[in-house]
Structures are given as structure tokens and as C-alpha cells.
Amino acid sequence: MSSVKRTPKQEIVTQFHCSAAEGDIAKLTGILSHSPSLLNETSENGWTALMYAARNGHPEIVQFLLEKGCDRSIVNKSRQTALDIAVFWGYKHIANLLATAKGGKKPWFLTNEVEECENYFSKTLLDRKSEKRNNSDWLLAKESHPATVFILFSNLNPLVTLGGNKESFQQPEVRLCQLNYTDIKDYLAQPEKITLIFLGVELEIKDKLFNYAGEVPREEEDGLVAWFALGIDPIAAEEFKQRHENCYFLHPPMPALLQLKEKEAGVVAQARSVLAWYSRYKFCPTCGNATKIEEGGYKRVCLKEDCPSLNGVHNTSYPRVDPVVIMQVIHPDGTKCLLGRQKRFPPGMFTCLAGFIEPGETIEDAVRREVEEESGVKVGHVQYVACQPWPMPSSLMIGCLALAVSTEIKVDKNEIEDAHWFTREQVLDVLTKGKQQAFFVPPSRAIAHQLIKHWIRINPNL
């Protein structure tokens, strides 16, 4: 700081800047309370109080000035912002405070590219062929086609049989029981007792269609193998199991559904979500009257002639999807992540924080709100990574990275049981050694696991 005689204004600016440079929060607060216009004042070299705090490594001063609304975009005579200064001098925590405040720049350690990935439950064997849902004649013909595949459900649990392989997560692999018309024709004869959903057609044309050339009229053969989900009641399900001892209904949903082959899991995710909607909305949500099923199981139509739901398009008439944000919260210095646990979790399991998006809320704001509600940690920059259908019963998990701008954890016991910052080394040990460690994370087929791995992969030298 120069010792040249200054004007009264220059003197107070100098004192303000000195208090920021020295980390004197009490003095800084006092000066600013009397002279709030000093917040963005610059010295002769173009430096602001924020720059001095960033240069000397005072995160509490930086946080205070940011909360007061100081301008982070000001550049000094060397064309540096406060963020540039913090990065140059190696103050990672401060650099991220400056970069991750809402509306700020992307944190310096995040990559610009996020590779698109397919998570478990998102792969499928089928083309949904939604244009066929209104073609009742086509659907009826496919129901009795000998090549058509039916997958059976009871209480939302799919009928499966054990497969012969094991995968890396050490769970026995199970496969869907793919039934044909002969297996289930008695159920189709009692439509009032079943739920039938058209799922789509196989993506690959199979030679087996040619085996039925004599059984199907030539004009009805289009080369498409249709799949349907068939929901039956528990009594019928028990009778079916007794006749097919090598099959069983997969239960409980978690973690049992994670044992399916990946493409079959995508089919189950679709079927289970629609069947869950069907079981929960048997009556019109608008007027309470009975409904009928149309569009291959994808629409409920009210039977009351003057019901408002019959005028226009209403989301109450179609299967619902519940958007959920799930986020890997990263410490401001980039070297730790925030994981939490709920009481219902297995002992020792920690995972990413998550929560439902509220009406009128963006993905980014939902991330910030949920993290603060559950852990007390404030979040700035949010970056989308990937999503995953989650049929429990019909959620869409929207996976994000979330950069914390505060570090103190204040757990809301009504939301979660516990939360901690975990170092990169701790998380790496868990991913490589599993449950041998003091804690563990969800299995690889859950998006939480993939978000954690994604964080580990970015800037591995941090």
C-alpha cells in the first residue's frame, strides 16, 4: 500500500482494502456498514477488496463480500479478476467460492465435456411403437400371434427364472420368463381381472416369425414381434407358479431388480411404471368416476360424459413420471464429496443426496434447495451429468454434480440421518475394496454409484 498522502476517501478505501487483505472481518464489517458504497471501490492498481482477500487466502472475507453482492467480474490493471488471482496463487477453496456462486462461472476443475451414458434401466430390447397404440385391430391381432411375448407381473413383481451367469456385482443373474399366447390365453379371456399393457416391438427382426408362416394370415404378418406386460392378481399368480416351478416373482424390488440382464431391466422399468400408475389411478382424478383403458394401456379415459378431463389433453389421463434430482456434492476445493444416509438404509451405506423437483422449479434450483434442506450446505454451480429411469414406482433420476460454496454440515434429522465429507482417497478405497471399508456406496447399477465414479474420474490429480 502506498504511503503518499491521500484524500479522506482514498484513506477510507485503503483501510477497507487493508482489512480485506489482513482478514480482519470485524473491521471490514464496520467500515462497510458505514460506507456500503466501498464494496466495489478500486485502488490505483484497479484492485478491489475481493481481490485482496483472494490474494491473501481469506475465504471468510470472500464469502462475506459475495453475500454483500460485490462484483466478481471487475478486472484490475493487469486484466485479472478475483478468480484469476485466487487460481494463480493456488487458493482452490477461494477459487471455487468465486466460481460456483449461483450464476457464476463453471468451477475450474470441472471438465467441459460430459459423455452421454446409458444407465441401468435405460437400455431396452424394444421400440415402443407408440403409433400402434391407437390401432386396436393391430393390438388384438398381436395378442394372439404365436410369436408375441408376454411378461407376467403380480403386485408389480415380474416373473423370472434363474440365469446361468454371474456378473461383477456378485448377484445371481435372473432372466424374464418370456411367455407366449398359449401360456396366458386363459387370462386374456377375463379382461376384467387383468391389466394388459403394450410395451412395443423387438428392435431386431427374428427368424422365428417364419416358423409361424402357416398359422398367421399373410396380410396380418408385418415382421414385428410384439411384447405385452400382463398384470394378474396374487391368487392367479400363485396358481401359475405351481404349474411352473422353475419360475418365481422377483421380490422385493430392491435390490432384486438389479439382478436382471440390462436390456430386460429396461423393459421391466417401462412395464412396472405403467402398471404402478394403473393400480394407483383406477378412478378419474378429476371427478372420481370409473375409467376405461385405451391406447394400449397408456391412457385412462373417464366414463362420465361431462367430465372436464374429456376436453383437451390432461396429464391425469396418462402415466406419470416423477422427476427427482440426485447430486454428487463436491467440496469447494474439489477434493471431497458429500454423502448422506437415511435411517432405512443398510448399516454403513452412504449415497448421493436426492429429492423430488417441486412445481415451478428448475433442476438447478431443486439441487440447491434439496442439498441445503438435508445437509445445510449451500450449492452454487450445478452441472447435469446423466439420468436414469427408476421404477419405484415411476421416478426419473436426474444426476448432477453440485459445487458447494459452504462446508459446514447441519443435518435435518427429518430428512436424513447423517452426512459427511469423504475424501477422494476414502471413496476410491470403497469403490475398489467394497464393504471391507468403514462405509459403502450403492451398487454399480444405481446412478448414485455412477455419479460418484464420474467425480473420481474428473481431474484425478486433484
From Swiss-Prot:
Which SMART domains does the record associate with it?
ANK
Where is this protein found?
A: Cytoplasm; Peroxisome; Cytoplasmic granule
- Binding sites annotated in the UniProt record for Mg(2+) 3: E370, E374, E415
Positions of short motif Nudix box: 355-376
PROSITE patterns reported for this sequence: ANK_REP_REGION, ANK_REPEAT, NUDIX, NUDIX_BOX
List ligand-binding residues for Zn(2+). Answer: C284, C287, C302, C307
Q: What terms describe the molecular function in GO for this protein?
A: magnesium ion binding; NAD+ diphosphatase activity; NADH pyrophosphatase activity; NADPH pyrophosphatase activity; RNA NAD-cap (NMN-forming) hydrolase activity; zinc ion binding
Q: Which cysteines are joined by disulfide bonds?
A: none
**Which InterPro entries does this one have?**
Ankyrin_rpt, Ankyrin_rpt-contain_sf, NAD-cap_RNA_hydrolase_NudC, NADH_PPase-like_N, NudC-like_C, NUDIX_hydrolase-like_dom_sf, NUDIX_hydrolase_CS, NUDIX_hydrolase_dom
**TM segment ranges:** none
A GO BP entry? circadian regulation of gene expression
Q: Where does Mg(2+) 1 bind?
A: A354, E374, E415
Q: Cofactors per UniProt?
A: Mg(2+); Zn(2+)
Query: How many and how are cofactors bound here?
Result: Binds 3 Mg(2+) ions per subunit.
Keyword annotations for this protein? ANK repeat, Cytoplasm, Hydrolase, Magnesium, Metal-binding, NAD, NADP, Peroxisome, Repeat, Zinc
As for family, the record states:
Belongs to the Nudix hydrolase family. NudC subfamily.
PANTHER family, alphabetized:
NAD-CAPPED RNA HYDROLASE NUDT12 (PTHR42904:SF6), NUDIX HYDROLASE, NUDC SUBFAMILY (PTHR42904)
- Described function: mRNA decapping enzyme that specifically removes the nicotinamide adenine dinucleotide (NAD) cap from a subset of mRNAs by hydrolyzing the diphosphate linkage to produce nicotinamide mononucleotide (NMN) and 5' monophosphate mRNA. The NAD-cap is present at the 5'-end of some RNAs; in contrast to the canonical N7 methylguanosine (m7G) cap, the NAD cap promotes mRNA decay. Preferentially acts on NAD-capped transcripts in response to nutrient stress. Also acts on free nicotinamide adenine dinucleotide molecules: hydrolyzes NAD(H) into NMN(H) and AMP, and NADPH into NMNH and 2',5'-ADP.
Instruction: Relate the assembly described in the record.
Output: Homodimer. Homodimerization is essential for its catalytic activity and protein stability. Interacts (via ANK repeats) with BLMH.
Give the protein name, as stated in the record: NAD-capped RNA hydrolase NUDT12
